[in-house]
């Protein structure tokens, strides 16, 4: 290693930051990760120049400690207090931060650690067989990322490795997961790198879909693609074990392997259009293969959850079925309970969040479908520029949930609105609610009766609002795609149709002119990029030579 690297050591106040593992009645392992959430504690800068120092750090972690691979911002002290984003509430208190990417960062162009997290959950036999045929996990990864062979890294087995029973001395098979911390040249490219590596694993036959609790299809591969953010907690503390379980600590001893820093862009470039097409084909085949199982799981989940919801709220079973069905489709209606990480928010519903979005913005919670069984702190409440509320979840990848009113809550709100506010309230509810056209029409009729405004006028008002919303959504989507762009290659803006094209084309020509590839871009005799024109040919007869035509050849 040359340049020193930095990570952040997180210490939780008042409890563990690791899993509790116990034995179930049938002798299998029961793992409880509900404590793996942090609302208060400290963050400490840790700088190291040798991988052995990092390995020693994580080997001796206590159960209340974890790491973030991003470093504290350079203007922050070496040790700070950590609180939640809600309690910080935008304040700039000295020595106090929230565990967000505002405070924990990967400086662009600077080396850092990137986590390759291997887990076999849901792995089908075909993928397991392929890994075995390739010679194991490392050869499988090398088949996708050959440059990994010479990369400096620290490798450690999962939290549940090396378990045994003290009463019998028998070993117990735990998780065969692995954490591999790679030194990369540009930590800021880590998120793109992991997502691309995940896609390339799919192309190599090392990816799969699994059916979730709600019948949703979850995308997996031999590496976790969503651990690339600088503020994400990585749990390395020893687990809490209930008797008679114990752990052989040597089985988890980190192994430091010296080598070079990985150039993630050169070693794992963005997918080509052909590769993207192949990836879509593989996904489609997996979706078709699992469709019957997914439908069965979804139906069972809806029946069970609808029964629970009807019993809790007293609503009729038909409405409860619709609520849970929409939840499976990514739309959360008012009666759905959200499982926030903050115990003070226990029992909070979607209706509570919609009534006071500012209070909940930024709050973390469990995935609305996977629940706390999958883990806490997997999702976050977000707000768009127009005020609409949504949930960004990173459980099993990335999932978006929309929080919306249903007809009953929309009708109640409209009837409570003042007469002069009814038209605007109607438009807002029609735009943001989960409503059918018949329900929108009924809301319009209520607004008409209360205000006396012509129905056609209300329809036109809603139509104009929908057009403005569609235009704004298109603009935001374009901006978001630009901001989230994973391709690290530079881009040039396309000139407008009536603008000057020569400066842009000259820039493209200069770049391509320096291409030294075996098969460089096609160029003409003047060494400029060749211009290719497509022409519609009415008949292949026109492509033959006249002499050939005359001879009948």
Task: Say what each PLM segment does.
Residues 8-12, 40, 70-73, 150-159, ...:
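A generic structural motif
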Residues 109-111, 175-177, 229-231:
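Short, solvent-exposed loop/turn segments at the edges of secondary structure
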Residues 126-146, 181-211, 246-247, 253-257:
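Helical (often loop-to-helix) elements that flank the catalytic cores of nucleotide-handling enzymes
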Residues 98-106, 141-173, 220-225, 378-380:
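Catalytic micro-motifs at enzyme active sites that drive phosphoryl/nucleotidyl and oxygen chemistry
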């Amino acid at each position: 290693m040359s340049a020193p690297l930095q990570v952040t050591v997180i210490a939780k106040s008042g409890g563990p930051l690791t899993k509790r593992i116990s034995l179930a009645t049938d002798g299998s392992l029961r793992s409880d990760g509900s404590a793996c959430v942090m609302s208060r504690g400290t963050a400490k800068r840790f700088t190291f120049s040798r991988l052995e120092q990092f390995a020693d750090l994580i080997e001796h972690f206590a159960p209340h400690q974890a790491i973030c691979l991003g470093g504290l911002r350079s203007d922050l002290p070496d040790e700070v207090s950590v609180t939640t984003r809600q309690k910080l509430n935008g304040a700039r208190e000295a020595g106090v931060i929230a565990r967000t990417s505002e405070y924990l960062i990967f400086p662009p162009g600077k080396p850092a650690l990137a986590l390759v997290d291997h887990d076999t959950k849901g792995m089908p036999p075909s993928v397991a067989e392929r890994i075995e045929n390739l010679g194991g996990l490392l050869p499988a990864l090398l088949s996708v990322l050959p440059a990994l062979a010479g990369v400096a890294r620290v490798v450690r087995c999962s939290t549940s490795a090396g378990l045994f029973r003290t009463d019998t001395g028998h070993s117990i098979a735990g998780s065969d997961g692995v954490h591999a911390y790679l030194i990369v040249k540009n930590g800021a490219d880590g998120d793109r790198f992991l997502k691309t590596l995940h896609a390339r694993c799919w192309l190599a036959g090392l990816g799969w879909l699994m059916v979730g609790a709600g019948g949703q299809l979850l995308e997996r591969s031999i590496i976790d693609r969503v651990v690339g953010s600088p503020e994400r907690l990585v749990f390395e503390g020893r687990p809490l074990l209930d008797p008679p379980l114990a752990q052989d600590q040597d089985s988890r001893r980190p192994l430091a392997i010296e080598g070079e820093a990985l150039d993630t862009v050169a070693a794992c470039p963005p997918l080509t259009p052909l590769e993207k097409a192949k990836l879509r084909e593989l996904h489609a085949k997996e979706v078709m293969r699992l469709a019957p199982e997914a439908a069965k799981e979804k139906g069972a989940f809806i029946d069970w959850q609808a029964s629970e919801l009807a019993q809790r709220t007293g609503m009729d079973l038909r409405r409860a079925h619709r609520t849970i069905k929409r939840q499976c489709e990514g739309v959360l209606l008012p009666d759905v309970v959200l499982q926030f990480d903050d115990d003070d928010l226990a029992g909070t519903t979607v209706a509570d969040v919609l009534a006071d979005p500012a209070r909940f913005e930024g709050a973390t919670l469990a995935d609305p479908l996977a629940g706390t069984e999958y883990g806490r702190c997997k999702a976050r409440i977000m707000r768009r520029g127009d005020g609409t509320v949504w949930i960004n979840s990173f459980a099993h990848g990335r999932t978006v949930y929309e929080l919306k009113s249903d007809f009953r809550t929309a009708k109640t709100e409209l009837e409570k609105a003042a007469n002069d506010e009814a038209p605007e309230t109607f438009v807002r509810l029609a735009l943001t609610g989960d409503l059918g056209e018949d329900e929108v029409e009924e809301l319009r009729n209520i607004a008409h009766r209360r205000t006396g405004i012509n129905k056609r006028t209300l329809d036109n008002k809603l139509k104009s609002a929908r057009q403005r919303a569609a235009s704004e959504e298109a603009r935001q989507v374009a901006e978001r795609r630009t901001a989230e762009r994973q391709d690290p290659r530079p881009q040039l803006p396309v000139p407008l149709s009536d603008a000057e094209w020569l400066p842009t084309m000259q820039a493209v020509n200069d770049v391509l002119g320096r291409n030294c590839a075996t098969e460089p871009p096609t160029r003409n005799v003047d060494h400029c990029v060749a211009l290719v024109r497509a022409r519609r040919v009415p008949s292949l007869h026109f492509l033959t030579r006249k002499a050939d035509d005359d001879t009948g050849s």
